[in-house]
């Protein structure tokens, strides 16, 4: 129909626009600095905060978002850092297989044995404390090299991020705890995993910039995240 053709044409235009933007950013050398802006810390910080805000139901949604972001780290993140795509990185990534198994179980509505499910839940809650400890250890090893640039990038991450999340909620017509979790996850600071990927695939100048953004955005999130959580609990509960 005419409507379907118009929708398909709109999708193609957006794809072409995205490719052009990536090409221009690549020629300017900015593309390697995008991961800290586009990939928040939905694991180390996002999971515990969503658990605190919405309980186990919020943890489930936040875990799904975190799994998607982790997959992006080993696909889009590597592509942006290295300027080329590598299938080997995905195949060597444990989260990739964990996501496949999860999707398989959900699609066929399969139930795990009771002892497996109970063990998984115990490990899940224990992991919450471990990832918070690992975040603290990782941050002590990072330093700020360019404060002005880091502040600018961090504002884009912790302030522009939740604004984009709010527009996503409106676009997908989300409500309740699902909308709140998405908003909270979008407000998280830059993920430490950005630094690990950059240290492997990017030059030292970019690595220093990524490290600075992670530290500054995490410090700024101590102020911004409580505000976002308050807003989420008030309007999406």
Q: How should each PLM-predicted stretch be described?
A:
Residues 5-6, 49-61, 110-114, 167-179, ...:
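Helix-coil boundary and interhelical linker segments in multi-pass alpha-helical membrane proteins
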Residues 64-67, 71-75, 92-104, 126-135:
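Hydrophobic mid-bilayer segments of alpha-helices in multi-pass membrane transport proteins
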Residues 13-17, 35-50, 61-80, 94, ...:
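Membrane-embedded alpha-helical segments of transport systems
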């Amino acid at each position: 129909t005419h409507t379907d053709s118009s929708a398909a044409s709109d999708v193609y235009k957006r794809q072409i626009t995205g490719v052009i933007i990536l090409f221009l950013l690549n020629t300017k050398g900015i593309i390697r600095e995008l991961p800290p802006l586009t990939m928040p810390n939905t694991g180390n910080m996002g999971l515990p905060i969503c658990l605190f805000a919405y309980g186990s139901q919020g943890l489930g949604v936040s875990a799904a978002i975190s799994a998607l972001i982790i997959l992006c780290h080993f696909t889009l993140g590597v592509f942006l850092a290295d300027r080329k795509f590598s299938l080997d990185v995905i195949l060597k990534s444990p989260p990739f297989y964990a996501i496949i198994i999860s999707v398989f179980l959900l699609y066929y509505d399969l139930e795990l044995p009771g002892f497996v499910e109970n063990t998984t839940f115990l490990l899940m809650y224990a992991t919450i404390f471990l990832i918070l400890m690992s975040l603290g250890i990782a941050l002590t090893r990072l330093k700020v090299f360019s404060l002005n640039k880091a502040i600018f990038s961090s504002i884009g991450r912790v302030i522009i991020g939740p604004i984009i999340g709010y527009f996503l909620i409106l676009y997908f017509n989300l409500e309740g705890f699902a909308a709140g979790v998405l908003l909270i996850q979008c407000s998280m600071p830059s993920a430490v995993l950005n630094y690990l990927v950059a240290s492997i695939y990017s030059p030292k100048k970019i690595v220093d910039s990524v490290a600075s953004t992670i530290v500054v955005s995490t410090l700024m999130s101590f102020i911004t995240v409580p505000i976002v959580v308050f807003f989420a609990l008030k309007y999406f509960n």
